[in-house]
């Protein structure tokens, strides 16, 4: 299991590399921005031996599949091509499918768009991973049933939103073979975008020992990104390592 940090800019990736983390999760938002930054990211790779996972741009036109197909799909294809230039093998995507807010007919069209994205990711040698935003575990079976190559990024902090019990427990138990990456940050519950606080670990209400125990019991042994401020990364890494080794039960 490898722990990395979230980098929204090259300077943050450099901080993460200098701090000794094995990887950074970088934002790839537009091909133009990527072309300006790719040389800097490569220098960090050469200097520190760091590797990258990627986070795509925010979804737009959530309820307009025709615009997603016309604009967002080609954008994601281009960004997957960019990611391949840095030998990135995991690409996280926001693509909201919470059936409490996205109608079934729109969700069905979005799943077809997601299938096309996943097909392009496969050609690039990249695992495309849909991230849980507010979705329940019941929202994902129709997706995974028709998109064999799609992975999941389990966001533990998001799991605390719009629910009485963190959904990470059910995701870890129900879809262990799909979970390719994990996001870690603390939250205090709530039901709005503003409630997604991305707090340092220990400043919210999430029971990380219990959730990490579920993941470890299912045999998870891939990457985890701390999606918190860079100043809190080292302490967050220590918390996760100690919890994983001493508190989370072994499989």
Q: How would you name each of these model-derived features?
A:
Residues 5-7, 26-30, 52-58, 93-95, ...:
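A cross-domain feature marking catalytic cores of carbohydrate-active enzymes
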Residues 64-151:
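Active-site acidic/histidine proton-transfer and metal-coordination neighborhood
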Residues 1-80, 84, 151, 249-251:
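N-terminal pre-domain/capping segments
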Residues 22-23, 51, 89, 127, ...:
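Residue-level detector of anion-binding/catalytic polar loops
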Residues 1-2, 9-17, 87, 137-154, ...:
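Histidine-acidic metal/acid-base catalytic patches
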Residues 42-59, 111-121, 147, 208-213:
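Alpha-helix-loop-beta-strand connector modules within alpha/beta enzyme cores
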Residues 60-66, 99-103, 162, 190-198:
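A short acidic, helix-capping loop that chelates divalent metal ions and anchors anionic groups
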Residues 38-42, 68-77, 106-115, 164-173, ...:
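Charged helix-capping and loop-helix junction motifs
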């Amino acid at each position: 299991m490898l722990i990395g940090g979230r980098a929204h800019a090259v300077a943050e990736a450099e901080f993460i590399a200098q701090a000794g983390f094995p990887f950074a999760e970088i934002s790839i938002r537009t091909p133009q921005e990527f072309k300006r930054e790719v040389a800097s990211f490569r220098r960090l790779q050469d200097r520190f031996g760091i590797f990258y996972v990627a986070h795509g741009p925010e979804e737009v036109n959530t309820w307009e599949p025709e615009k997603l197909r016309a604009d967002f799909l080609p954008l994601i294809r281009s960004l997957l091509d960019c990611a391949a230039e840095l030998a990135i093998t995991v690409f996280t995507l926001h693509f909201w499918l919470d059936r409490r807010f996205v109608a079934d007919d729109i969700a069905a069209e979005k799943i077809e768009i997601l299938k096309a994205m996943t097909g392009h990711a496969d050609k690039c040698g990249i695992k495309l991973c849909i991230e849980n935003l507010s979705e329940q575990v019941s929202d994902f079976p129709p997706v995974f049933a028709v998109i064999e190559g799609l992975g999941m990024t389990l966001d533990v902090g998001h799991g605390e939103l719009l629910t009485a019990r963190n959904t990470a427990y059910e995701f870890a138990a129900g879809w262990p073979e799909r979970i390719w990456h994990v996001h870690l940050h603390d939250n205090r519950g709530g039901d709005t975008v503003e409630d997604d606080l991305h707090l340092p670990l220990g400043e919210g209400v999430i029971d990380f020992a219990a959730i990490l125990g579920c993941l470890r019991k299912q045999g998870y042994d891939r990457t985890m990104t701390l999606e918190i401020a860079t100043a809190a990364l080292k302490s967050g890494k220590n918390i996760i390592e100690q919890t994983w080794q001493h508190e989370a039960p072994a499989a």
